[in-house]
Amino acid sequence: MYPSPVRHPAAGGPPPQGPIKFTIADTLERIKEEFNFLQAQYHSIKLECEKLSNEKTEMQRHYVMYYEMSYGLNVEMHKQTEIAKRLNTLINQLLPFLQADHQQQVLQAVERAKQVTMQELNLIIGHQQQHGIQQLLQQIHAQQVPGGPPQPMGALNPFGALGATMGLPHGPQGLLNKPPEHHRPDIKPTGLEGPAAAEERLRNSVSPADREKYRTRSPLDIENDSKRRKDEKLQEDEGEKSDQDLVVDVANEMESHSPRPNGEHVSMEVRDRESLNGERLEKPSSSGIKQERPPSRSGSSSSRSTPSLKTKDMEKPGTPGAKARTPTPNAAAPAPGVNPKQMMPQGPPPAGYPGAPYQRPADPYQRPPSDPAYGRPPPMPYDPHAHVRTNGIPHPSALTGGKPAYSFHMNGEGSLQPVPFPPDALVGVGIPRHARQINTLSHGEVVCAVTISNPTKYVYTGGKGCVKVWDISQPGNKNPVSQLDCLQRDNYIRSVKLLPDGRTLIVGGEASNLSIWDLASPTPRIKAELTSAAPACYALAISPDSKVCFSCCSDGNIAVWDLHNEILVRQFQGHTDGASCIDISPDGSRLWTGGLDNTVRSWDLREGRQLQQHDFSSQIFSLGYCPTGDWLAVGMENSHVEVLHASKPDKYQLHLHESCVLSLRFAACGKWFVSTGKDNLLNAWRTPYGASIFQSKETSSVLSCDISTDDKYIVTGSGDKKATVYEVIY
């Protein structure tokens, strides 16, 4: 009656589902996944940007290298073209002097020489490349030798070994038809890895403290460095308002750099100066004063100038002001032979490291002094400590890098050669090992003159308008024991001299009068004043018998004073510009003077005449005569120290200073001497060949120095208003 129930309903589609619902946790999870994806993408893009930045830096370095190489090629091409033109002209001029048959042969040979094929060029350049690769392999081997200094890559031929390491085309061969066998199968091009590898080797070869200076800088580093430089510039601008640093007053100052091993470089500033015209004594005075004048040189200027020492604050003195002058016709020309400036790196980077960024010189035929000579092998270095090296360590002169020579010998023919130092150059009796600073005397003004008493007890420092006396026998004493007010308040004292008895002090400076002080009285007092016609005195010397005083005047004259009668007895005339420095021989028979006229002159004190004249290419700022030998050391404005023999043409030229050599003094033993300069350096040298004994760097220009009579102490006066006392360690 009722239908049976359907036990198994027919199969149909799934029941319809409701709308999908997302929970908050699912949404946050999806956001997190998208954020992680974007962060990974950002990190990838950031890495790509850094990679592109590094590639950009590498490309810029390559661009500089290519530019330097192309410019060098251009200069060399013009040079060779000019040489070829001159040689061709010379051949054409000499042809008429040959016989007719010989003329034809020469013409044919010249024409054959002009026919240079591409195959010959490829062959020649291939040989040059092989030679450059061999040189590179030798240098790589030399770098691996223990005890050897890092190799200076900047001195390589840019088209030889350097091109091989950089993966650059070798010279102009990239412009020629290259045969398939151009590249050697065993040499693989390094592409962009060359500069990075060279840079890594450089960073590994320097000390850890200096490694970061030679790494590739990212744009962020450059930006930070720019901000840091702005901050430093603001600090420097504020510091310039003070007169802490004395600036030597040289009109033709140039930034010359010495190849010192530590590679330190001090920037130099040029300051203007004012000139005071001084009248020169031309006629005998009514008091019967003798005036000795040697025959004047042809072309010498008759006008004299007395330089005033002017600085930023219009108060600081410097060396006798350098006056721009036209060389006289018979001035010494540069000697033929080796130019020491070409034998040494001249830029700020330390020796053995690549040079500074290339700067194109103004003259296309003039190579910048800091660039290595193309095609010229680097100089053979010089090692002053060869005697202490073991046999297992090779001498650095066998390598192409290392400490450059700084001492050169000039023979009678005028050629300069590096000096081979003897084994006892830095050892032996009377040769110090170093100097230790033991005291600082805060004078309060720029210290332009210093001297030490005998026995060593007092130090006299001359500044602006006064001389201060210090007792250095008590190291803890920081105050002067007395103050001697000299000259005028605003005039700087340029020289102070003690008589051997220690009872009399003579003071000269930027005034026409010399002050003679009696130190034996209970209170030091001025017992006499000597007045000259010159407005300033630059240097003083005392005869061994203490009877005569010699003063270098700003008008070029050398005044001779009788200290007993306190009168002027004679004037030596010859310098055509201010006389800046002076010294006397131990026997008192000969006087040596240096001047701003680029000359050093010797005078016979018995006969009252000039004996010799030495012409230089730079102004003379300091000199000293060896107490035990016939050697005269001269410090010059161009940073050189030259040691001359009094009677022979031999001389030595020393190159460790980076700026003007402002003072110089021999030790009493005569075996060594010291020099100071505007580069803040105190250098000690071996007599006469100039082996560097020790070196000390101060914080400002070192204007003056003196050595005690027992050779145990050195005193220096500097532009930061203090004097420094050193103990010499033997």
Swiss-Prot record:
Motif (Nuclear localization signal): 227-230
Domain of life: Eukaryota
Basic and acidic residues bias: start-end ranges: 198-233, 254-283
PTM per Swiss-Prot/TrEMBL: Ubiquitinated by XIAP/BIRC4. Ubiquitinated by hyd in response to Wnt signaling, leading to degradation by the proteasome.
Protein name: Protein groucho
Compositionally biased intervals (Low complexity): 296-308, 322-345, 353-362
WD repeats: 442-480, 488-527, 532-571, 574-613, 615-654, 656-695, 697-730
Spans annotated as Binding to basic helix-loop-helix domain: 262-425
Function: Transcriptional corepressor that regulates transcription when recruited to specific target DNA by hairy-related bHLH proteins. Maternally required for neurogenesis; in the segregation of the neuroectoderm. Directly or indirectly interacts with Notch and Delta.
Ranges of biased composition (kind: Pro residues): 366-382
Renumbered residue ranges of the record's region Disordered: 144-411
One Pfam family cited in the UniProt record for this chain: TLE_N
GO molecular function: CRD domain binding; DNA-binding transcription factor binding; HMG box domain binding; transcription corepressor activity
Quaternary context: Forms a complex with the hairy/Enhancer of split/deadpan family of basic helix-loop-helix proteins in order to repress transcription. Its activity in regulating transcription depends on other proteins as it lacks a DNA-binding motif. Interacts with hairy/hry (via WRPW motif).
Cellular component terms (Gene Ontology): nucleoplasm; nucleus; protein-containing complex; transcription regulator complex
Chain residue ranges for the region called CCN domain: 206-267
Family, per entry: Belongs to the WD repeat Groucho/TLE family.
Spans through the membrane: none
